[in-house]
């Protein structure tokens, strides 16, 4: 298993399918990286030489924000929205959909499981 940017990638997978296991790199970015470095995307990761793996790692760290740095930036962006108390920040704080989706009938993923509200039995 090759370690690139702190992530263990399987040797038996092709490069274009192994690179998206790194947070911040998707399919098209993986293809762009292979094209920029002149590496065959259908080549398996285990077939790369240590020099090629080093150039791959250097290229990724130089041109892309991945893993911890990217996670930290996303978290800081959300925290900034919550600090300035804008609409999107308030939606994040309340755990509701941020991008304008309706919440009357859906949004179960953001709202979590249903909370049962029981009615109190009154006097008759």
Swiss-Prot record:
Coiled-coil portions: none
PROSITE patterns: RIBOSOMAL_S13_1 (PS00646), RIBOSOMAL_S13_2 (PS50159)
HAMAP family: Ribosomal_uS13
Signal sequence region: none
Superkingdom of origin organism: Bacteria
GO BP annotations, alphabetical order: translation
Function per UniProt: Located at the top of the head of the 30S subunit, it contacts several helices of the 16S rRNA. In the 70S ribosome it contacts the 23S rRNA (bridge B1a) and protein L5 of the 50S subunit (bridge B1b), connecting the 2 subunits; these bridges are implicated in subunit movement. Contacts the tRNAs in the A and P-sites.
Spans annotated as Disordered: 95-124
PANTHER family: 30S RIBOSOMAL PROTEIN S13/40S RIBOSOMAL PROTEIN S18 (PTHR10871), SMALL RIBOSOMAL SUBUNIT PROTEIN US13M (PTHR10871:SF1)
InterPro entries: Rbsml_uS13_C (IPR027437), Ribosomal_uS13 (IPR001892), Ribosomal_uS13-like_H2TH (IPR010979), Ribosomal_uS13_bac-type (IPR019980), Ribosomal_uS13_CS (IPR018269)
Similarity remark: Belongs to the universal ribosomal protein uS13 family.
Keywords noted in UniProt: Ribonucleoprotein, Ribosomal protein, RNA-binding, rRNA-binding, tRNA-binding
Name of the protein: Small ribosomal subunit protein uS13
Subunit text: Part of the 30S ribosomal subunit. Forms a loose heterodimer with protein S19. Forms two bridges to the 50S subunit in the 70S ribosome.
SUPFAM superfamilies: S13-like H2TH domain (SSF46946)
Ranges annotated as biased composition (Basic residues): 101-124
Natural source organism: Coprothermobacter proteolyticus (strain ATCC 35245 / DSM 5265 / OCM 4 / BT)
